[in-house]
Amino acid sequence: MKGGKAIASGSYGCVFKPALLCEGDTERKKDYITKVMYHSYADLELKEMKMVGDVLKEIPDGDKYFLVNNITRCRFSELDGDDVKGRKNKCSGAFDKSLTDREFNLKINKGLITGINIPYGGKDLLDTIGPNLTSKTFININKGIINLIKNGIVKFNKKKLLHLDIKHMNMLYNPKDKNVRLIDWGICAKYTNDVVTEGVKDRNLM
């Protein structure tokens, strides 16, 4: 088994946990996930991470509030029988359901599909908050969100950076350190001279 199983999907990528085995590595990275996506989207995401990282590195203890560091390209070989379990259902948001395992692997071999390794930050708040949520975890999540807003979001907003897609699915809770971290900067934007473009005025301006 080269990696993990598909666990979630967004519009542009499908998440595998544990991480897939990247070319040149003898073992998969521990405490990482692999976001599998089309090559062009991976290029764009890495470029965005570089831009965002340059801003967020100036924020004290930024690693407590964001997942933008230690993100690397992961070129992997064909998915095997274990890797592909649940791929069609879990990855339907990023890849067409009609794409067979053979066609999927063919796109990998052609370099059309690649991956990005990202540190595992926990489950998103949509999956975390439910009927089995304990009062202790609820309190920890609330504290984590308050710290994220006060020490993270407010500070990068002051640096004229807007995330524009802050919601429960883009916030991860890690029970180990009790932090809530913001992810998915795909539609973020920087602005100048206190002017926000018309295209983003209908979004959450944070």
Question: Can you say where each PLM-predicted feature lies in the sequence?
Answer:
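Conserved N-terminal boundary motif of the eukaryotic protein kinase catalytic domain
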Residues: 1-6
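Catalytic-loop of the protein kinase fold
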Residues: 157-174
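ATP-binding glycine-rich loop module of kinase domains
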Residues: 11-94
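Conserved structural core of kinase catalytic domains
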Residues: 62-141
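C-lobe/activation-segment region of protein kinase-like
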Residues: 179-206
